[in-house]
């Protein structure tokens, strides 16, 4: 038989060694015995015993031989070395996608070939067979670990423990060969159920049993396999096949994250705009040969063949509504702690669900609290919260989001849904997927040392969790590149259905690009190309055919506009870039407010800045108050002597607004205040404690009336998604609960919102005047050129 390649680590050095050999076929047995013969020849005086490694669920009787070996030699045998070995079968290099999918079929797993395939491999490609040894340990070391960490009572329990340790050591040796992207926890259920720590906590839960806890661990377990990891990466590429095949990364960020992950376990918290995100993160880790993530997902996604496949690729499905199930909460908490302790990485959406508006939702803290508990309990000296920004040039799901905003029901997940979802990805090209990894947040920095004072201070811990989560979200936003899609849609939405020429689009976009460059905002390739007319043409053409732009090219030159029925879809893209213009938009509105204020206009300016921040806090992320004020001052510092101009008011403030580039608040923020105003108008004659559904239904009805009467600029603010946030705003203003002056305060709030909308009108008028003046100048220049 042709000899296999021996792993350099597969050398026995101890004088007394028990080899636990994982041998699943006569071929593997022969390979290992040949290898053992080489070891004996290398060290003639050493004692090498070999025993077949018991399977993971071996009955007690199958452990008798191992028990005898562990007990042999009494005290002298305590320092006997235990070395696990197995034959590792290297998959063929450069396998096709079809071959990877075929690896799931019975008898086709390249990592575990059947005996016939093994013999063929040794004849044709013996380099693919490798005798691999796991890390060794002495009997005394293993016995101490067993006594310290488990509830085992007899020698058969100890033998079970040794067998599990051998399997885990072989798994570690295997992923060192394959690469970190195949790293995954093994034997989680038996390890946890045997843990003294786990059993002690279980005893504190009334009625809890080991059997029931075991069933819950089966539900959480990933059932990981190498072939499933390969297939899931193929599935990820299939789901995202409508995009460019290569994801767009920042290589410096990838290198920094690789270094960080070598030191500490991490939770990868990704922004969530599409179901594709769940496939993007694992593929991104594989692309960059980074350790895999074990992603939490709702049990609603565990359907058909997808459930088992995703489990084996590292997906952890969790139940919903677990507040009334203390045993499940405990098992989930301990499961998270175990995975973190073993230095595996977790992942989920920081927003908890897809953002159907395009802007980032507030972070959810549920799972984060379990990770914090694991850290505070000393499971790791630090845990990194690694943000992941995922953005797209385009998404096919925006049509669904627009329908949902109008009141449609969510489509339930299932096999037919998945088929249609994957099918839709091939309908056209959606551009690029951009993946960014901003600097990670240290849990230790916010929670202090493990077992520290914050451990038992629930209020302090929750506050720290909120600060951590918001910091991660803030870093995600700052790392998210601007896309041409978002910038173009923002511009066309302000035109309110009026078509623009290529020249108008190109010229108007330059102010925004100048601002983003000045602020050193990350830019996508598509956004950078907007500097040229060709880049603008490529961007609007990609969005044409109502995706969501309409092109008219039957005249002298093509023009582009957004039809009323496509405004909600376009708003999704516009909303994805608002965060970059949020502070400068607030500056414009505060200037318009101060322009018409009496008395101290500087005070009026700053008061309105902070008031607008307070009203928008449920829709957008802001820096803390001090940093926010500093950012606003920095925005104004671009205008010389701005404070005296604001204090003077009138024409002096107008001069600032006319000089400001870009003038963009009307494009970015108006729709949110229109939605707030619709809800506030509904509240004028609504009862106290009105239910959210009733408020939304009334707002949809009144909003449609507003659209028909042209009391709002478009149909965009008539959205269940925006009304949900508006409900939070009015609740924060204490306009829902009963009070003696409720009617007066509701009317006052509506009046305040209408004043803000008048400020939008004022800024918008200046922006339009400037646009018209520029167009007239450009036309005059063209006429002069023609006359020459």
Curated annotation (Swiss-Prot):
Motif HXXXXD motif positions after renumbering to this chain: 271-276
Keyword Oxidoreductase: no
Major subcellular location class: membrane
Pfam families per the UniProt record, alphabetical: Acyltransferase, GPAT_C
Record EC number: 2.3.1.15
EC category: transferase
Subcellular location: Cell membrane
One annotated GO molecular function: glycerol-3-phosphate O-acyltransferase activity
Any single biological process term in GO: CDP-diacylglycerol biosynthetic process
Record bears the keyword Nucleus: no
HAMAP family recorded: Glyc3P_acyltrans (MF_00393)
NCBIfam families recorded: PRK03355.1
Record-given protein name: Glycerol-3-phosphate acyltransferase
The organism of origin for this protein: Mycobacterium marinum (strain ATCC BAA-535 / M)
Protein encoded by which gene: plsB
């Amino acid at each position: 038989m042709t000899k296999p390649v021996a792993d350099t680590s597969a050398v026995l050095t101890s004088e007394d060694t028990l080899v636990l050999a994982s041998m699943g076929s006569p071929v593997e047995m022969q390979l290992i015995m040949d290898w053992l013969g080489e070891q004996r020849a290398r060290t003639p005086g050493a004692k090498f015993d070999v025993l077949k490694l018991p399977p993971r669920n071996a009955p007690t009787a199958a452990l008798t031989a191992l028990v005898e070996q562990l007990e042999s030699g009494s005290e002298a045998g305590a320092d006997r070395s235990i070395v696990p070995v197995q034959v590792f079968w290297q998959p063929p290099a450069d396998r096709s996608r079809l071959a990877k999918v075929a690896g799931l079929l019975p008898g086709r797993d390249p990592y575990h070939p059947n005996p016939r395939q093994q013999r063929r491999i040794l004849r044709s490609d013996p380099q693919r067979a490798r005798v691999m040894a796991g890390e060794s340990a002495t009997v005394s070391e293993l016995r101490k670990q067993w006594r310290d960490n488990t509830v085992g009572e007899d020698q058969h329990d100890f033998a079970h423990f040794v067998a599990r340790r051998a399997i885990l050591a072989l798994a570690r040796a295997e992923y060192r060969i394959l690469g970190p992207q195949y790293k995954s926890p093994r034997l989680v259920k038996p390890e946890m159920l045997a843990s003294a720590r786990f059993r002690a906590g279980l005893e504190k839960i009334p009625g809890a049993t080991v059997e029931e806890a075991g069933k819950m661990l089966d539900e959480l377990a990933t059932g990981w396999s190498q072939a499933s990891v390969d297939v899931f990466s193929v599935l990820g590429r299939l789901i995202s096949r409508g995009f460019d095949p290569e994801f767009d990364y920042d290589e410096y960020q990838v290198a920094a994250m690789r270094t960080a992950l070598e030191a500490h376990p991490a939770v990868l918290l990704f922004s969530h705009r599409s179901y594709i995100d769940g496939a993007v993160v694992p593929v991104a880790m594989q692309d960059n040969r980074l350790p895999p993530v074990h992603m939490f997902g709702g049990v609603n996604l565990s359907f058909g063949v997808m459930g088992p496949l995703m489990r084996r690729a590292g997906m952890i499905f969790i139940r919903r509504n677990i507040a009334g199930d203390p045993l499940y909460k405990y098992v989930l908490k301990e499961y998270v702690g175990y995975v973190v302790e073993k230095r595996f990485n977790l992942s989920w959406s920081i927003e908890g669900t897809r953002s159907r508006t395009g802007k980032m939702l507030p972070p959810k803290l549920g799972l984060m609290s379990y990770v914090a508990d694991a850290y505070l309990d000393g499971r790791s000296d630090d845990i990194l919260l690694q943000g992941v920004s995922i953005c797209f040039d385009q998404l096919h799901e925006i049509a669904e989001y627009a329908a949902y905003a109008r009141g449609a029901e969510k489509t339930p997940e299932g096999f037919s849904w998945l088929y249609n979802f994957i099918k839709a990805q091939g309908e056209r090209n959606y551009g690029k997927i951009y993946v960014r990894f901003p600097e990670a947040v240290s849990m230790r920095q916010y929670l202090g040392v493990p077992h520290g004072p914050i451990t038992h201070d629930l209020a302090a811990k929750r506050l720290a969790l909120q600060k951590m989560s918001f910091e991660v979200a803030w870093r995600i936003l700052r790392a998210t590149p601007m896309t041409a899609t978002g910038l173009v849609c923002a511009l066309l939405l302000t035109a309110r259905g009026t078509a623009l020429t290529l020249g108008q689009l190109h010229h108007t976009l330059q102010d925004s690009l100048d601002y983003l460059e000045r602020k050193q905002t990350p830019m996508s390739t598509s956004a950078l190309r907007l500097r040229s007319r060709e880049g603008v043409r490529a961007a609007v053409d990609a969005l044409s055919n109502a995706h969501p732009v309409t092109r008219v090219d039957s005249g002298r030159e093509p023009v582009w506009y957004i039809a009323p029925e496509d405004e909600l879809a376009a708003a999704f893209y516009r909303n994805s870039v608002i965060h970059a213009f949020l502070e400068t938009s607030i500056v414009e509105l505060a200037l318009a407010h101060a322009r018409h204020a009496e008395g101290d206009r500087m005070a009026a300016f700053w008061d309105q800045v902070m008031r607008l921040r307070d009203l928008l806090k449920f829709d957008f992320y802001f820096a803390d108050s001090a940093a926010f004020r500093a950012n606003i001052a920095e925005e104004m510092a671009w205008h010389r002597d701005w404070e005296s101009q604001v204090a003077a008011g009138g024409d002096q403030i107008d001069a600032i607004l006319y000089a400001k580039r870009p003038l963009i608040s009307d494009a970015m923020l108006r729709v949110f205040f229109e939605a707030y105003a619709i809800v506030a108008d509904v509240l004028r004659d609504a009862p106290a404690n009105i239910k959210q559904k009733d408020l939304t239904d009334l707002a949809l009805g009144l909003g449609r009336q507003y659209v028909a009467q042209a009391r709002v600029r478009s149909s965009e603010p008539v959205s269940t998604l925006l009304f949900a946030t508006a409900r939070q705003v009015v609740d924060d203003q204490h306009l829902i609960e009963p009070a003696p002056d409720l009617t007066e305060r509701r009317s006052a709030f509506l009046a305040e919102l209408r004043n803000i909308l008048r400020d939008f009108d004022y800024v918008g008028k200046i922006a339009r005047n400037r646009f018209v003046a520029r167009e007239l100048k450009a036309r005059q220049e063209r006429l002069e050129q023609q006359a020459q």
